[in-house]
Structures are given as C-alpha cells and as structure tokens.
Amino acid sequence: MKYIKDNLEKINASISDDVVLVAVSKTKPIADLQEAYDAGQRVFGENKIQEMVAKYDALPKDIQWHMIGHLQSNKVKYMAHFVDLIHGVDSFKTLKEINKQAKKHDRIISCLLQVRIAKEETKFGLPYEEISTILHAEELKNLTNINIAGFMGMATFTSEETVLDEEFSLLKAFFDQNQPQHPNLKILSMGMSGDYKIGIRNGSTMIRVGSSIFGARNYIT
C-alpha cells in the first residue's frame, strides 16, 4: 500500500507548513490508517463516532482524532474523553452537550462552527447571521469546557472555480471580521480532495482530504 505514503508525500509537498492536513479515514480499514501513520500522518478525521472509537482503541495514542461528520448531541459522550476537534457544530444545543461531556472528563474540547456557505440545500451548517448570534451569546461565557477554535465550510459540489472562490472567500472575510473580537478563532477549515487547493488559495488553514490519500471509499461493515 505504498500509494498511501506516496499520496501523503505529494499532498504535503503541495501545501505550506501552516496548513493542517486532516486525513479523512472514514470507512477505511485500520491497516490503511496504520500505513498513513507510519508515513508520518497524525491527524485523522472520521464521520461516525462508533467507527472513530474503534479506531482510537486500536491505533497509537498520539493520533489527533477529528470528528468531521454531522454530530448528534446524544453521541458526544462516546468520544468526549479523546476527541481533539469537532468540525461540524451547527447548534447551541450541541455546544452545550459538548461542554457538559467535556466537563465530566475535565477537558476543554475545541470545536469549529459549521457555516453554510454552499448554495445546495442539502448541506448542514448555519447561515452567517446565526453564527454571529452564537459568538456573541452571553450564555457562551458559561460554556467553559469548550473552545470555539474557528469555522468550517463545505463548498458547493461543482467544478466551477469561480463559485468555489466566491464561497470560500466570503467565509475567509467573515473569519477575518470576527477574529479581532474572538482571538481564539484560529482555524479555518475549507477544502476537501476536489477543492482543497482553492480553499488554501482563499486562506484555509485546515483541509480534509480522503480519496486523494486513501483512494476510493471502502464501506466497512
């Protein structure tokens, strides 16, 4: 499976050191993740908590685990003891649950608020004005076991670069607008296998790449 190592080297050579590469390992067998780990990859993203827990138990403990899928509040408790970053937070209710579970483990869990930047109706996330409401909410000050570390956006599924540039650049402008008042905002997660170069061009500091590392998806049962 040398192709995994080769793919990682190729991607890392194309991005700067200040961009974090999240290897999206959902549906991939543990052997593939171990191969990526042996090639130096330490940040992995999963979209199902049960699968992430199983991989956490089986793999080295210096891995950083990111939850990148849409999060159900009632599942937070299963990963609160180890998850490093939760990407897809799009409700205050979920923030409160993450805070509650983090407190039980005496941890502060970092989260990214998911902004709805795509034109497609199927995408999760909140419109810009609702993100602003959360950031300025008085109640947020009481959630001392979470850290809102930045924003995540999924662009429209299209090959039209002008559309992607517009969506990503708007999110970057929103990030820049809010960062002075909220200095904990440090991460801008924009870009996946098909559009990460455009994301980086527009200021992304974190990319989520799966198929370009591991190949086509393998559904594991």
What is the role of each PLM region?
Residues 206:
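Conserved, well-ordered active-site substructure
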Residues 197-201, 209, 213-216, 220-221:
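Expand to "…catalyze enediolate/carbanion chemistry for C-C bond making/breaking, isomerization
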Residues 1-173, 177-194, 200-202:
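Conserved alpha/beta-domain cores
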